[in-house]
């Protein structure tokens, strides 16, 4: 697949992080609706979610959504997002990732997060990349550790407590 003008494409050894194709957006909506509650705060507005995914592949106002592609098939999605009601300092990006259930445990989340983190530091002037996760999400916590992130405290948001993981530019460069 060729990238459109200005679209972000990140290539790894097995994965390609790329813009979602229009035909893939409904599938991503269904994946969101069927998400494990451990992974999301709440289901977003469908129209707004789909509109955001139509801008996939472009970093716009702190938001970037990319498909996680394995051999031409979408196996998940990775994103930066702006948390509702919480301002991020300049150069700080919050990240979310979701993989299809059938491909978990094979290192794809680790590779996607490493590729995305590196791209944010290299191309988006990131100083800090962080992500909240549910304390019970042991697989995601392990992925953060494998990629060099560390737990940086807790955050209470939307009535839930989240563990915050992060990595700074200096930590990324020193790994």
Q: Where are each of the predicted segments found?
A:
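Acyl-donor (CoA/ACP) binding surface of acyl/acetyltransferases
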Residues: 1-35, 65-175
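Conserved GNAT-fold acetyl-CoA-binding loop/helix
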Residues: 34-55
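Short loop/turn motifs at secondary-structure junctions and domain boundaries
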Residues: 56-61
């Amino acid at each position: 697949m060729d990238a459109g003008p200005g679209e972000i494409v990140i290539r790894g050894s097995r994965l390609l992080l790329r813009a979602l194709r229009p035909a893939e957006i409904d599938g991503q909506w269904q994946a969101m609706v069927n998400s494990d509650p451990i992974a999301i705060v709440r289901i977003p507005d469908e129209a707004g979610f789909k509109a955001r995914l139509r801008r996939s592949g472009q970093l716009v106002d702190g938001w970037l959504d990319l498909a996680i592609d394995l051999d031409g098939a979408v196996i998940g999605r990775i994103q930066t997002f702006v948390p509702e009601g919480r301002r991020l300092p300049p150069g700080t990006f919050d990240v979310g990732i979701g993989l299809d259930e059938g491909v978990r445990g094979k290192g794809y989340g680790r590779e996607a997060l490493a590729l995305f983190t590196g791209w944010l530091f290299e191309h988006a002037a990131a100083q800090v990349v962080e992500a909240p996760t549910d304390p019970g999400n042991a697989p995601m916590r392990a992925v953060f550790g494998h990629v060099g992130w560390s737990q940086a405290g807790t955050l209470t948001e939307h009535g839930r407590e989240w563990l915050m993981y992060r990595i700074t530019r200096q930590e990324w460069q020193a790994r």
